[in-house]
Amino acid sequence: MMLNDVRPAIGAKKRKKRVGCGESSGHGKTSGRGHKGQKARAGGSIRIGFEGGQMPLIRRIPKRGFNNKLFHVFYAPVNLSALQGIQQEVIDESLLRQIGVVKGKWDGIKILGKGEITQAYTFKVHAVSASAKEKIEKAGGKIELIKSTP
């Protein structure tokens, strides 16, 4: 068997439906749209959910619930283990982005307590977990919380 002998299985390649190309094609004259009416016209389709002027189901059913997702603040999580070996005394967002610990778009930085810290750092961040705060203060470091601006 040669490569030029290979053919697709029967029925695997469906022919494109060519409309308006003669009566014998089966899709001539009205091109499968029927006779007249809104759906036969160009651009003539009703919007989704339209029920002919009757009050649509989506508007008949009452609204329920709410969410505050719009107001949620997404912090970039930074563990203490990721900060081992940093030479600078002050750790802020610009430094964390520069060394590649924080990437992407976030509303702020949150320091988490996974890992240990030995050097005394000054953190200028938006939030700190309780375990991280304890470990930072134990190592002699300070935390300056920044108010996040939406």
UniProtKB/Swiss-Prot annotation:
Gene3D superfamilies in the cross-refs: 3.100.10.10
A matching Pfam family: Ribosomal_L27A
Segments of this protein annotated with the region Disordered: 12-43
Cellular component GO terms, alphabetical: cytosolic large ribosomal subunit
Chain intervals with Basic residues compositional bias: 30-39
Top-level taxonomic group: Bacteria
Gene Ontology biological-process annotations: translation
Function: Binds to the 23S rRNA.
NCBIfam families: rplO_bact
Protein family (similarity comment): Belongs to the universal ribosomal protein uL15 family.
Record text on subunit structure and interactions: Part of the 50S ribosomal subunit.
UniProt protein name: Large ribosomal subunit protein uL15
Organism expressing this protein natively: Methylacidiphilum infernorum (isolate V4) (Methylokorus infernorum (strain V4))
Taxonomic placement: Bacteria, Pseudomonadati, Verrucomicrobiota, Methylacidiphilae, Methylacidiphilales
